A protein has these predicted regions:
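Alpha-helical transmembrane segments and their helix-start/interface "positive-inside/aromatic belt" motifs
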Residues: 14-22, 46-52, 80-88, 148-153, ...
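Helix-loop-helix junctions within the multi-pass membrane cores of secondary transporters/permeases
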Residues: 78-80, 87-158, 336-417
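Juxtamembrane and boundary regions of transmembrane helices in multi-pass small-molecule transporters
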Residues: 2, 138-153, 169, 173, ...
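Transmembrane helix-loop junctions in multi-pass membrane proteins
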Residues: 32-46, 66-74, 100-115, 134-146, ...
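Interfacial loop-to-helix junctions that mark the boundaries of transmembrane helices
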Residues: 13-19, 40-50, 82, 115-124, ...
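Intrinsically disordered, low-complexity non-transmembrane regions of multi-pass membrane transporters
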Residues: 1-19, 23, 74-88, 202-213, ...
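Transmembrane helical segments that form the transport core of multi-pass membrane transport proteins
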Residues: 243-356
């Protein structure tokens, strides 16, 4: 154990540098706004800065912890299920994994509180069942080799048909649920399951099919909330803004965070326990990993736990009030149109601080053998989230229905999926669920809510939906990146000189070449 801890110290330093590069640009933007056009109280600013420090340390521990624990656990379980060749086992375990992981996701509790007309436990169980069902669909797709775009057409078609019958109060929350429930605990494990399943296959499409699990799992919550929206009558939901901190000195500031920490200590423990318990069953029944491997996974789980506690405490206590207040101040100015470019700027950088984005970018780089680098993926995600936040701010200012953005957006994303390389499509639809994580829920959503409140808009219909917009645009930007890469490769092949022998064979049919 001591050897594992010592070996992880250099990696922690590396992760700290990555975390600083991700969070400091957001801090710089907020500080510039606070000292120029959007003044805030010292209390809010101090909470924001302490929250930022906790987020940096949290990202450092989480990213290394996920690499050491969540990824190898998921890969080994996925590989074991595939080796079993038992469809009933894959269906049963797949559903149970999806259900248990989702039911303990902290962000799902937040979502349930935002829909007062549906009992909390009814919503939580329905969404968890939706994720479990679609994790089974994702497994079967990989094993049967079904093309992802075909399933996306069917299921998103069903979603938009149901949306026509759902009260408008449910629409934004329903589409937000798809991004909220694929959080920092769910994503690393589910993505690793995909890699494990694909690793057992030896065909040339195995790498393509290692992605797409998060994409399909994001559909389950949307369908669940839409169906519940039809079954339950919409009620007048009362928006409760976050309580703005009011601390007069450093001791009160520490007490504010110290009092909030036990909540996240308990939440993250509850979230990780089902995954640990399921892995323990697999370890005893089939995996039989050696003590050194288990020790490494144990240290990784400890890092993951510490990282998520610090991250969520910093985001909820420090970032959420700051985001809400900044939105109010900017929308209350005569130059409220600045919400759009400022929102785009914040969106561009904030996705870099999403914990699960690190896991996605690293896995993409590994599976593609560096053909798609982590920096390229990061740029595509940043561009997508920047665009989505800009469009979300347009909605806040104008009150336009979210369907005017989602229907053409998803139609375009699914349409180009039939001409884009399969790998890019699967990565793109996974990226949508990954990008819309806790940073979106704790800063961008409160930012939109604060702006909407200052403008006197309908927060339920106009401010909610930011998560859905953030989940949609990466589908387009990542696929466009793939399309450009495909065109670049085609031009490179066309530019290569062709030998006379190759030209002679080019005009012959395939069977003639085989006979020769």
């Amino acid at each position: 154990m001591d050897i594992i801890l010592k070996a992880s110290i250099p990696k922690l330093r590396e992760k700290l540098l990555e975390a600083l590069q991700a969070v400091l640009p957001i801090v710089a933007i907020v500080l510039v706004l606070c000292f120029s056009i959007a003044p805030v109280s010292p209390s809010i600013l101090l909470c924001f800065l302490l929250g930022a420090a906790m987020i940096i340390v949290g990202i450092m521990f989480f990213t290394l912890g996920a690499e050491m624990s969540m990824s190898p656990m998921g890969e080994r379980v996925g590989a074991m299920l595939t080796k079993s060749r038992s469809v009933p086992l894959i269906i049963g375990v797949g559903f149970l994994l999806g259900f248990l992981i989702t039911i303990s996701e902290p962000d799902l509790q937040v979502l349930a509180n935002q829909v007062p007309s549906i009992p909390n436990m009814t919503l939580i169980l329905s969404v968890a069942a939706g994720v479990g069902l679609f994790l089974v669909v994702a497994f079967l797709r990989m094993l049967l080799g079904i093309a992802l775009p075909k399933l996306l057409v069917v299921f998103y078609g069903l979603i938009f048909v149901l949306a026509a019958f759902v009260p408008k109060e449910f629409l934004s929350v329903a589409f937000d649920s798809g991004g909220v429930t694929t959080g920092p605990i769910t994503v690393p494990f589910i993505m690793a399951l995909g890699v494990g399943v694909a690793a057992i296959r030896s065909d040339r499409h195995a790498a393509d099919d290692s992605f797409g699990l998060v994409a399909l799992c994001s559909i389950g919550p949307i369908l669940a909330v839409l169906i519940l929206g039809i079954a339950f009558q919409a009620s007048d939901s009362t928006y409760v803004p976050p309580i703005l901190p009011n601390v007069s000195d450093s001791v009160e500031l520490w007490h504010l965070f110290h009092e909030g920490l036990p909540t996240y200590i308990k939440e993250i423990a509850t979230s990780l326990l089902p995954i640990i318990a399921m892995f323990g069953v697999f370890q005893l029944a089939a995996l039989k990993l050696d003590r050194r491997t288990l020790g490494r996974i144990g240290v990784g789980l400890a890092y993951t736990y510490i990282g998520l506690v610090l991250f969520l405490a910093g985001a909820n206590i420090g970032f959420m009030p700051a985001g809400n207040y900044l939105g109010q101040v900017l929308a209350g100015q005569s130059f409220r149109w600045l919400l759009v470019p400022i929102g785009m700027l914040i969106g561009y950088f904030i996705v870099k601080a999403e914990p699960a984005v690190y896991v996605l970018n690293k896995q993409v780089e590994e599976v593609t053998d560096g053909a798609i680098s982590a920096s390229t993926m990061g740029a595509a995600l940043s561009a997508g989230v920047s665009l989505s936040v800009g469009l979300a701010m347009v909605r806040v200012l104008t009150g336009i229905s979210i369907l005017w953005f989602l229907i053409p957006g998803y139609a375009f994303a699914i349409g180009i999926s039939f001409v884009v390389p399969k790998l890019y499509t699967a990565i793109a639809f996974d990226a949508g669920g990954v990008a819309s994580g806790p940073m979106t829920a704790t800063f961008l959503l409160p930012f939109a809510q604060g702006a909407c409140e200052a403008l006197g808009g309908n927060i339920v219909t106009d401010a909610f939906g930011v998560v859905a917009m953030v989940a949609m645009t990466p589908l387009i930007t990542v696929q466009l990146m793939g399309l450009m890469a495909q065109l670049k490769q085609r031009r490179a092949r066309q530019a290569q000189p062709v030998s006379a022998a190759a030209l002679a064979f080019a005009d012959l049919p395939d069977d003639a070449i085989i006979e020769l």
